[in-house]
């Protein structure tokens, strides 16, 4: 199990405003280990994957870290390894493309149990707004307040 409370002094944080609804996806990397968590990866999964792996394509809208492989190595940051997917809640724009990220990364997906039902409605909710998302994913681990 991954400890999601990444206790680092200077985490590398990137924000992506993704999808037609411009939802904010955060990518947080521990600069000492390269461990990376993707938060709310509900849209444009390929954009996120391409950037995390090779700094290719349209990068983040904001970052406090390197913007190329060369800058990453110059900063002595290890190669990134996605260790978990996490959602703040299960609106379709936040969780709709989690299945695509789960295919790309063999990692656990964390979601609060109160959002399980909402997640089952992701496709139906998306269609109401004219969007299509894959069949909803099922969380691997339930987030609980105060637990690590």
Question: Where does each model-flagged region fall?
Answer:
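Intrinsically disordered, low-complexity boundary segments flanking structured domains
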Residues: 1-5, 127-130
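Short N-terminal helix-initiation segments at or just after the protein's N-terminus
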Residues: 2-7, 88-92
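Conserved beta-strand hairpin/beta-sheet module of binuclear metal-dependent hydrolase folds
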Residues: 3-62
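Active-site HxH/HxHxD metal-binding segment of metal-dependent hydrolases
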Residues: 44-47, 53-148
